[in-house]
């Protein structure tokens, strides 16, 4: 402790000495300055003159020297600017590094002074060296400051340039800025230049490698983004409708963000009241969960680096997780009506506060207006703020719990999109005239596109963009059909999937019963099949879609749930196991292939009862003729043989699974009700049941073995002989197939198992896509001309037959009455 006190006292003494020495040096420097006689010599009250008080070196007469006249470089002086620099840097937090440097300089100066203690007899040369060092450091600091200021100014100028380039007027007056943007856009993306997208959006377009906008995107963007109109859009499937409404939404959000940034630079924190941060800006409603997730994925890809959050709200997932994501306050929400209304009715704050909602989108709107579907949509529409008389620029005070917000009231834009939108001529005229009010249905149901648009708050002078052609179908899709009996549909389906099993294929069914029947048969026949229908859980749905996307030659058997908007790449073939109930559903089914300028094939399996429906369907699309899908009937016996075994196996397994399900159901409910099941079977019956089970299992095993042997060999045509064939008649294709077959057998012997699906399926025929087979051999066509007369004859004969049956039944009833009367009278 004593030594510590001594050291502290010594340090104090040294500091005092250094301060004294510093003062003396300053006085000496001041005394050595040349003085001017700017002030006359006078005397004060005590009689002393100013010259005696402020006497210089004796070289010049006395007087004051103004600070402007002092040049510190001439006198080797440095002005004490350290404190002022520190205060300036405290105001600007970006210059923390400079403040640290100045503090280090101060510490170094003190250390240098401490080291110099005890050297009272030091020469003036050392002082000059330290001064020079300090001057050099001060100059360095000034240069660093200048460089940092230049960098800041450059950043500000660049930001201003970007803002000026993005804030292009809606009327297109700034031609110079457009030229600058066109020069910056790469030549392969030059088609986007006319749309005047925000620079950040253009970066997303480059990253996604979209070379040019689609027709619907180009037509909708200028109308929606720059003119601010509501849009009713219709275009063929796979035409990019998601970005047609997604790009205007992102463009407006980015423009508003820049405007708020400019206001913040002018007005400071007052500009925050003009921002709508933390509120829902766009609400997109889709009919299916899969479509909602797909739209979310597309928008997230487009808004990846834009700091715009997109959240899906769909059923089949935990609502708690979705509520957590809504607490992040996303700008865009993509939802299905059921789960959206569930969260809205529960009072979810982010979904209920819709005063800042700028966009309301209905995707696949024609599906939402079907009778009996989406009753929640009516309740959602009732919650939307009224937009009958929008006043742009006026502010609206909104009470939110404890705070009162001044939010700018803006026009809400409504987008209605689908591949098939049928608007009546009266409704089109009504929209053009601008009469917003119309007669709604007495029940209040949303049962048409017209009512849906009006209830959603569609404003006057709406833009109707209808890019559908008379055929409505995609231009590169090729239609075909196979005429067959109802029992033969399974055989022809298996023929297409095995003989032409290349590329992704979707098989559409009208019922879940048909779906389970087909998937069960095809799985027994060794095909890797995915299923998708509404009764599946959401996790199983997503797994099924992922499996289908992962397989290049995948097969998806689905109901019309998949027909709406789902975008799966490289779907080559669509098979209609049964025709849909409406032409709109047929369009959406076919729209899963031939998407985004690609080609595809559609095959319809037509039974006799569906011929008239198919004719009317083709005529509604203005088809002059339809190709008949080419079939090689020499392979059909082998197909039928395999299918016969598969059906027997399927029926046995189905019967057994039903019995087990019934047994477990009885046991479960008996246990829950605390009841004992009566075992009425005798021992003989039990023995018979055991024998029957053993016999069925033995038969099942035998059928499975027989089918596995057939599946282990490639499918052969009827006339082909595996034992005797002339060497001259063997083609090069067949020779290559035999070599490949030998390799497969060797691989099977090494593995010791059964290869589930083989590359070599058919002898003497290449495994090609159905589209290639259709182009190669589909010359036979069914012409639609002249079918109307045949159809009329069929209808007339059918009416005549029904009339005759009706007359016969009536005569029979009369005869029966007469007989009863005779019996009663006798």
Curated annotation (Swiss-Prot):
Biased composition (Acidic residues): 94-128
Transmembrane segments: none
PROSITE patterns found in the cross-reference section: DEAD_ATP_HELICASE, HELICASE_ATP_BIND_1, HELICASE_CTER, Q_MOTIF
Biased composition (Polar residues): 49-58
UniProt feature, compositional bias: Basic residues: 11-22, 133-154, 815-826
Stretches of the chain forming a coiled coil according to its record: 125-166, 666-712, 783-810
Biased composition (Basic and acidic residues): 1-10, 788-797, 804-814
Binding site residues for ATP: 235-242
Keywords in alphabetical order: ATP-binding, Coiled coil, Helicase, Hydrolase, Nucleotide-binding, RNA-binding
Residue ranges, annotated region (Disordered): 1-62, 76-175, 783-826
Disulfide bonds: none
Molecular function in Gene Ontology: ATP binding; ATP hydrolysis activity; RNA binding; RNA helicase activity
Domain Helicase ATP-binding: 222-439
This enzyme's EC code(s): 3.6.4.13
Domain notes: The Q motif is unique to and characteristic of the DEAD box family of RNA helicases and controls ATP binding and hydrolysis.
PANTHER family: ATP-DEPENDENT RNA HELICASE DBPA, ATP-DEPENDENT RNA HELICASE RHLE-RELATED
Family: Belongs to the DEAD box helicase family. DDX24/MAK5 subfamily.
Name recorded for this polypeptide: DEAD-box ATP-dependent RNA helicase 13
Source organism (scientific name): Arabidopsis thaliana
Top-level taxonomy: Eukaryota, Viridiplantae, Streptophyta, Embryophyta, Tracheophyta
